[in-house]
């Protein structure tokens, strides 16, 4: 099918946080941690459609467990509904603190299908699953998943995920190549 059938990303929605907002949040984060005796230096900032991850490098002698136990205090200091702490960030010597964006942006499948990640994919059956925390399109190979379980709370995006998988199949193969029966018991 032509890509015109899919909606374009709203440009205003992609600008959910500007650099000044990031700097202000980063300063609040460092200040909040220092109030609890945790000295850190700010690292990279990864902006995704729904959350922004702030990488912080703890000073020598700071225990990671101490940062993990401050999640509610960090959320309070940043005026966020909640924060998630990834300690340590795999492959890096830092702690990631994920903060919800004030205005989450929608992830459109057209953005993923038009991306280099999709067009350059070596997957036998590529599926567009969304975007990573960093905002990078997430494309994976359905053939590498012998079993697939989609679960989550109400409103978490299970149906959207299934729709993305079906649309990925339709945009990757011709009608002669794709044959499936879908049953929705609802």
Question: Model regions: which residues?
Answer:
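Post-Walker A helix-loop "phosphate-sensing" segment adjacent to the P-loop in P-loop NTPases
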Residues: 168-178
